[in-house]
Amino acid sequence: MKAIVFAYHDIGCVGLEALALAGYEIQAVFTHSDAPGENHFYASVAKTAAGMDVPVFAPEDINHPLWVNRIRELAPDVIFSFYYRTILSDDILQLPSFGAFNLHGSLLPRYRGRAPVNWVLVNGETQTGVTLHKMVSRADAGDIVAQSVVAIDDEDTALTLHGKCRTAAATLLAQQLPLIRSREIALTPQDDSQASYFGRRTAADGLIDWQKSAHEINNLIRAVTEPYPGAFTFLGERKVIIWRARVVKNNRVNVNHPHGGDAGSIISTSPLVVSCGEDALEIVSGQSEAGLYMSGSRLAAEMGMVPQARLGNLASRVQRRRTRVLILGVNGFIGNHLTERLLRDDRYEIYGLDISSDAIARFLGDPRFHFVEGDISIHNEWIEYHIKKCDVILPLVAIATPIEYTRNPLRVFELDFEENLKIVRDCVRYNKRIVFPSTSEVYGMCDDKEFDEDTSRLIVGPINKQRWIYSVSKQLLDRVIWAYGAKNGLRFTLFRPFNWMGPRLDTLDAARIGSSRAITQLILNLVEGSPIKLVDGGAQKRCFTDIHDGIEALFRVIENRNGQCDGQIINIGNPHNEASIRELGEMLLTSFNAHPLRDRFPPFAGFIDVESSSYYGKGYQDVAHRTPSIRNAKRLLEWEPTVKMEQTVAETLDYFLRTVDVPHTADATDTQG
C-alpha cells in the first residue's frame, strides 16, 4: 500500500518506523523545518526519513496547489499524519483512495487541538492516551480507528508523559497498521457532545497565578517544566522560573506564617515555601532568568528572598505598554463585538470613532476604551492624529447593505472607497499596520466550489448592474493595499467576512427602510406580522457565520503571533453553515414559534416570492452561492468555526425580540380602574 506521510516530533519518527515495519511503501515524507529559538528535544523526522532513503520535504505551505498537484501525481493509497502541525486541506485529504489517518495525542473527542499532553497536566487529568482516527475537514473530528489509554502519575511531567504516549503510539500502530493495509478496520464515530478543544500554548502561558490552589499551580509547573520554557513568576521586576515543586497542605505550614488570603507571600526560605489561594507550594528547584538551575532554598538566598515578600505578576508593577487599536466604525456590528473581545484582554487599549454610541454604551466607563462621536468624512485631522498614535488600524466604516448599492451607488463609492483610501494612505505615511475589512462580495459571480483567497477569480457583472459598486470598491482597495505592501512595505492583513450574524447586527428601524441585512429584515416581518419576502424565491445560498466565531478569528488577526498574518488575505466564514435564504427564513420561523415571547406578536403571514428588481431596484444581480475556503484561517490563525447556525439564529432572534417595545395586554388579574 502506497503511503504519503506528514510527520514531526518523536511521534512522527515512531510513525515512520511503524509504517516501514508494517510493509508500507512510503512515497514521500512531509515535515517542518525546525523553528529558530525552539527547544528541539525530540528526534528528527527528516533524519529518520533520510535513513530510510525516502524523499523528504518541508514546504512553507503544504496546501498550496503546487504541492497538492505533486501529491496527486504520486496517487497514494493512504495518507498518515503523525503530529504534523499544519491542518491539511480537503484537496489533500481527498487524494488517497483509502483515506487519510491521523494519530492524535489524547483520548478523542476530548482535548482536540494543540498541545494535548501539556493541557491534560494543566487541567489535572489522571489519564490521557493516543487516538488513531480518520481525517476530515474539521481537525481531530473524524471517526476513531483505535485508542490506547495512558495513566498519568502525580510525578509525571510533560516530558515523561510524552514518553508514555510515544510508547503507547508504537504499540497502537503495530496493531492497527496491518489492519489498515488489509482494509479491515472498523470505525467508531466521535461523540461531538463530549468534545473539548484547546489551542496552542506559548511561553507566556507559564505565568503563575498565586490565587489558584497549590495543586493547580503544581499542575502548571509539571506541564511546562523542562524541556519547555517553565512556569514563572516575578520578585519585583526579576523573573523567577520554577522547575519543580510540591504541594504543602495547610496543616503542614508553620502556624506562625498564616497564608490564607496572602497568595504569593513567601512563608519560609529554607525550604522555600509560597502561599497560594489554597494550601502552599514548596519550590524544589528553579532559577533566576539569567541564573543557574538550583534548589529552592539556594534560589531564595541568591535572589534575596525573605519571609512575607510577595511573588506575583510583573504586569501589576511595571506595565508594558498596551497595543493601541484604532477602530473606525466602532459602534457597528463588528466594531462593538470586537471591542468587547479586545477589552477582555488586558494587552489592548481601544480608540474608537463613530456617529453614534448606542451599541458601545456598555464600554464607555472602561478606562481602556476612548470614544469620540464623529464622521470619518469630517474628522480627518482626528483620524490622522490617532493613526499616528495607534499601532493597529481597523477602518470598519462602509455602506454594506445591498439595497444601497442600487439606490445610492455614488455614496457607496465615496464612503467605501474614497474615504477609506485616505486612511490607507495615512497608514502608509506613518508606517502603521492596517487590518482591512475586505468582503466576500469581491468574489462576485465566481464559479469555484469554494472561494479561495489566493486562486479564485473575482468576477462581477456588466456596468449597468450597479449592484457591483460595493464589490469593486472593496476589490480596488484590496489591490491598492496589496500594492502599498509590495512597494512601500505597508504591513497589512485583508480579512473577508462571510455573512456574519448575531445580536446587534442591525436595528429593526434600519430594516423598516430596507437598509439592513437579510436576517434582520426577516425578523422584522415576523415581529410585524407581515409576509416574509423571498427575493427570487430565496434560493440563493450563503454560509452564515456566528459573530463570536468571526470575532475570535479577527482577534487572532490583530494579535498576529510571529507576524504570520502580515501580507495575508484571510476568509473568515463557516462553510458548514450553508443554507438558502428560504431555509434561513424557515429556521427563523421555527425558532420564533418556540420562543417564550411568541404570543406577544401577530400570527405568521407566510412567505411570498418577489423579483429582485422590484425589491432592490433596477441594476441588481445576485449570485447562487458563496462558500469560503478557510484553509488560510486554519493555517495562520489555528482557527475553525464551531457555532452551529441554529444557535446563531436563535440568539439573534432572541436579541431582537427582547428589544421590541410591545404594548402590555391586561389579563384577568389586572386591576381595572
From Swiss-Prot:
Positions of the record's site feature: Transition state stabilizer: 102
Annotated stretches, region: Formyltransferase ArnAFT: 1-311
Chain positions recorded as UDP-alpha-D-glucuronate binding sites: 400, 405, 439-440, 467, 499, 533-542, 620
Catalyzed chemical reaction(s): UDP-alpha-D-glucuronate + NAD(+) = UDP-beta-L-threo-pentopyranos-4-ulose + CO2 + NADH; UDP-4-amino-4-deoxy-beta-L-arabinose + (6R)-10-formyltetrahydrofolate = UDP-4-deoxy-4-formamido-beta-L-arabinose + (6S)-5,6,7,8-tetrahydrofolate + H(+)
GO CC terms: membrane
Pathway of action: Nucleotide-sugar biosynthesis; UDP-4-deoxy-4-formamido-beta-L-arabinose biosynthesis; UDP-4-deoxy-4-formamido-beta-L-arabinose from UDP-alpha-D-glucuronate: step 1/3; Nucleotide-sugar biosynthesis; UDP-4-deoxy-4-formamido-beta-L-arabinose biosynthesis; UDP-4-deoxy-4-formamido-beta-L-arabinose from UDP-alpha-D-glucuronate: step 3/3; Bacterial outer membrane biogenesis; lipopolysaccharide biosynthesis
Site positions (Raises pKa of active site His): 140
Active site: 104 (proton donor), 441 (proton acceptor), 626 (proton donor)
A single GO molecular function term of this UniProt record: UDP-glucuronate dehydrogenase activity
Positions bound to NAD(+): 354, 375-376
Region of interest: Dehydrogenase ArnADH: 321-673
UniProt KW keywords: Antibiotic resistance, Lipid A biosynthesis, Lipid biosynthesis, Lipid metabolism, Lipopolysaccharide biosynthesis, Multifunctional enzyme, NAD, Oxidoreductase, Transferase
Protein's GO biological process: lipid A biosynthetic process; lipopolysaccharide biosynthetic process; response to antibiotic
E.C. designation(s): 2.1.2.13, 1.1.1.305
Residues involved in (6R)-10-formyltetrahydrofolate binding: 114, 136-140
Pfam families reported in the protein's UniProt record: Epimerase, Formyl_trans_C, Formyl_trans_N
NCBIfam families to which the protein is assigned, alphabetical: PRK06988.1 (NF005414), PRK08125.1 (NF005998), PRK11908.1 (NF008872)
Known role: Bifunctional enzyme that catalyzes the oxidative decarboxylation of UDP-glucuronic acid (UDP-GlcUA) to UDP-4-keto-arabinose (UDP-Ara4O) and the addition of a formyl group to UDP-4-amino-4-deoxy-L-arabinose (UDP-L-Ara4N) to form UDP-L-4-formamido-arabinose (UDP-L-Ara4FN). The modified arabinose is attached to lipid A and is required for resistance to polymyxin and cationic antimicrobial peptides.
PANTHER family: BIFUNCTIONAL POLYMYXIN RESISTANCE PROTEIN ARNA, UDP-D-APIOSE_UDP-D-XYLOSE SYNTHASE 2
Family: In the N-terminal section; belongs to the Fmt family. UDP-L-Ara4N formyltransferase subfamily. In the C-terminal section; belongs to the NAD(P)-dependent epimerase/dehydratase family. UDP-glucuronic acid decarboxylase subfamily.
Subunit record text: Homohexamer, formed by a dimer of trimers.
The protein's name in its UniProt record: Bifunctional polymyxin resistance protein ArnA
Organism of derivation: Pectobacterium atrosepticum (strain SCRI 1043 / ATCC BAA-672)
Lineage, opening ranks: Bacteria, Pseudomonadati, Pseudomonadota, Gammaproteobacteria, Enterobacterales
Gene name as annotated: arnA
